[in-house]
Amino acid sequence: MGCRDILLTFSVALLLISLFQIWLFREGRQVPELSDDQLGKDRNTLMTSKNKNKNEDVQRLFQRYFKGRSFGLNNTNSRFEDSNRRIPSSPDRLHN
Protein backbone atom coordinates (compact mmCIF):
# COMPACT_ATOMS: atom_id res chain seq x y z
CA MET A 1 0.00 0.00 0.00
CA GLY A 2 3.00 2.34 0.24
CA CYS A 3 3.13 2.85 -3.52
CA ARG A 4 -0.57 3.66 -3.66
CA ASP A 5 -0.20 6.29 -0.92
CA ILE A 6 2.69 7.95 -2.74
CA LEU A 7 0.71 7.98 -6.00
CA LEU A 8 -2.34 9.47 -4.26
CA THR A 9 -0.22 12.16 -2.59
CA PHE A 10 1.47 13.01 -5.88
CA SER A 11 -1.83 13.27 -7.76
CA VAL A 12 -3.38 15.51 -5.05
CA ALA A 13 -0.30 17.74 -5.09
CA LEU A 14 -0.44 17.97 -8.89
CA LEU A 15 -4.13 18.89 -8.72
CA LEU A 16 -3.48 21.59 -6.13
CA ILE A 17 -0.62 23.07 -8.14
CA SER A 18 -2.72 23.19 -11.31
CA LEU A 19 -5.63 24.81 -9.44
CA PHE A 20 -3.25 27.40 -7.97
CA GLN A 21 -1.93 28.25 -11.45
CA ILE A 22 -5.46 28.61 -12.80
CA TRP A 23 -6.34 30.94 -9.93
CA LEU A 24 -3.14 32.93 -10.38
CA PHE A 25 -3.59 33.48 -14.13
CA ARG A 26 -7.29 34.23 -13.72
CA GLU A 27 -6.39 37.13 -11.46
CA GLY A 28 -3.87 38.47 -13.97
CA ARG A 29 -4.25 41.97 -15.36
CA GLN A 30 -5.75 42.17 -18.83
CA VAL A 31 -4.85 44.98 -21.20
CA PRO A 32 -8.02 46.53 -22.64
CA GLU A 33 -8.22 46.93 -26.39
CA LEU A 34 -8.84 50.34 -27.87
CA SER A 35 -12.31 50.79 -29.30
CA ASP A 36 -13.15 52.55 -32.56
CA ASP A 37 -14.18 55.67 -30.67
CA GLN A 38 -10.85 55.92 -28.89
CA LEU A 39 -8.89 55.40 -32.09
CA GLY A 40 -10.93 57.86 -34.11
CA LYS A 41 -9.88 58.70 -37.66
CA ASP A 42 -6.25 57.74 -37.11
CA ARG A 43 -6.96 54.02 -36.87
CA ASN A 44 -5.47 53.21 -40.28
CA THR A 45 -2.45 55.40 -39.57
CA LEU A 46 -1.87 53.63 -36.27
CA MET A 47 -2.21 50.18 -37.81
CA THR A 48 0.15 50.94 -40.70
CA SER A 49 2.74 52.42 -38.34
CA LYS A 50 2.63 49.25 -36.21
CA ASN A 51 3.14 47.08 -39.31
CA LYS A 52 5.94 49.36 -40.51
CA ASN A 53 7.70 49.19 -37.14
CA LYS A 54 7.37 45.41 -37.14
CA ASN A 55 8.84 45.16 -40.65
CA GLU A 56 11.73 47.44 -39.66
CA ASP A 57 12.42 45.29 -36.60
CA VAL A 58 12.41 42.13 -38.72
CA GLN A 59 14.79 43.68 -41.24
CA ARG A 60 17.10 44.95 -38.49
CA LEU A 61 17.21 41.54 -36.80
CA PHE A 62 17.78 39.80 -40.15
CA GLN A 63 20.70 42.09 -40.96
CA ARG A 64 22.14 41.65 -37.48
CA TYR A 65 21.85 37.87 -37.48
CA PHE A 66 23.08 37.25 -41.02
CA LYS A 67 25.53 40.19 -41.00
CA GLY A 68 24.22 41.71 -44.20
CA ARG A 69 24.44 38.57 -46.32
CA SER A 70 21.63 37.82 -48.72
CA PHE A 71 20.07 34.37 -49.01
CA GLY A 72 17.82 34.72 -52.05
CA LEU A 73 16.59 31.67 -53.92
CA ASN A 74 18.04 32.86 -57.23
CA ASN A 75 21.34 33.91 -55.74
CA THR A 76 24.31 32.71 -57.83
CA ASN A 77 26.93 33.50 -55.19
CA SER A 78 28.43 30.61 -53.30
CA ARG A 79 27.04 30.10 -49.82
CA PHE A 80 30.47 29.80 -48.23
CA GLU A 81 33.09 32.45 -48.48
CA ASP A 82 36.42 31.23 -49.83
CA SER A 83 38.31 32.78 -46.93
CA ASN A 84 36.53 30.51 -44.44
CA ARG A 85 37.25 27.23 -46.24
CA ARG A 86 39.99 24.89 -45.07
CA ILE A 87 41.88 22.99 -47.70
CA PRO A 88 43.29 19.67 -46.52
CA SER A 89 47.07 19.65 -46.60
CA SER A 90 47.59 15.90 -46.52
CA PRO A 91 45.66 12.79 -47.53
CA ASP A 92 45.69 11.57 -43.91
CA ARG A 93 42.26 12.27 -42.38
CA LEU A 94 43.63 12.30 -38.86
CA HIS A 95 45.83 15.35 -39.47
CA ASN A 96 43.32 17.44 -41.46
Swiss-Prot record:
Superkingdom classification of source: Eukaryota
Database matches in InterPro entries: CLE27/CLE43
Signal sequence extent: 1-28
Transmembrane segments: none
Organism: Arabidopsis thaliana (Mouse-ear cress)
Alphabetized UniProt keyword annotations: Developmental protein, Differentiation, Glycoprotein, Hydroxylation, Secreted, Signal
Lineage summary: Eukaryota, Viridiplantae, Streptophyta, Embryophyta, Tracheophyta
BP-aspect Gene Ontology terms: cell-cell signaling involved in cell fate commitment
Gene: CLE43
Keyword match RNA-binding: no
Ranges for region Disordered: 71-96
The keyword Isomerase belongs to this UniProt entry's keyword annotation: no
Glycosylation sites: 74, 91
GO cellular component: apoplast
Name listed for the protein in its UniProt record: CLAVATA3/ESR (CLE)-related protein 43
GO molecular function, one term: receptor serine/threonine kinase binding
Modified residues (Hydroxyproline): 88, 91
Record-stated family: Belongs to the CLV3/ESR signal peptide family.
